Swiss-Prot record:
CDD domains: ALDH_C (cd23933). NAD(+) binds at S11, G12, N13, I14, S159, A160, G161, P162, G163, T164, R165, A166, N167, N287. Keywords: Aromatic hydrocarbons catabolism, NAD, Oxidoreductase. It comes from the Bacteria. SUPFAM superfamilies: Glyceraldehyde-3-phosphate dehydrogenase-like, C-terminal domain (SSF55347), NAD(P)-binding Rossmann-fold domains (SSF51735). Its EC number is 1.2.1.10. It is an enzyme of class 1 (oxidoreductase). The keyword Cytoplasm does not apply. This is Acetaldehyde dehydrogenase 1. Belongs to the acetaldehyde dehydrogenase family. GO terms for biological process: catabolic process. The active site is at C128.
Amino acid sequence: MDKVKVAIIGSGNIGTDLMMKTLRSSSLEMAVLVGVDPRSDGLARAERLGIATTSGGLDHFVTTPEFEDVAIVFDATSAAAHERHASILAQLNKQVVDLTPAAVGPYVIPTVNMDRVVGEPNVNMVTCGGQATVPIVAAISGVTPVHYAEIVASIASRSAGPGTRANIDEFTETTALALESVGGATQGKAIIVLNPAEPPLIMRDTVLCLCDEADETEIEAAVERMVASVAEFVPGYRLKQKVQFQRYTRNSPLRLPEQEADFTGLQVSVFLEVEGAAHYLPAYAGNLDIMTSAALRTAERMTELDAIRGK
């Protein structure tokens, strides 16, 4: 089967890492890298690899001969930029995989809902924190109702480029919504920390869920199965320690300032780390790896299901 040609908009950290992964794909062909900064390392690297490039942004890319041959467009720019890109690409009948928090299309978490939404013309990969934590919330909510899910994603400051920094507010909003709509939590909250420590620290994620009483061994098994599923395409994704449990009873409830009633039930805490494959940035940048690996897996699944718009 012929490979499907793809283009990536955004020549920063995420776009360049995705480019390096796409070059390894058995079903996708890296056709064009699109940027706006002619001095960017991503564009220079693409040129050295013999990949077509443009520093004229999407506006110039759509006028080039290569555009017609591209079936899937990855957008690795910013939420604000994607709002405009989505409209242009929709009019031109291109399949879009959005790696920004813009969330124009439905959220995609490969291990949770990928096959249900890959047929949509524009799909959203949530955020790096969402890709790491929503699967865990979904695993727990598959065992017992999750009333509240809170996640903290800590990433190395050095791994966060201009696009990521511009998206901080959208990161928290989009991740929280995905915890609810895909993860199954009644209420979600997300926090991101850009850790400036040197040497840079590996990506760490904490997931805290308040849920109904349930069998702890069943929850732990569900979490471990989900971790194994994610690790199939993100090998550096793993549990940092065993799943932690704490029970709150009527005699010792958990007082929540934002809730009218005290919480009684089970608190589940899951601690994760994500080591990158170092295809572009070093292994500490697991936040890049999980985002780009999820996007690549989604696009490859589109080719498997022949669910590419305009084909």
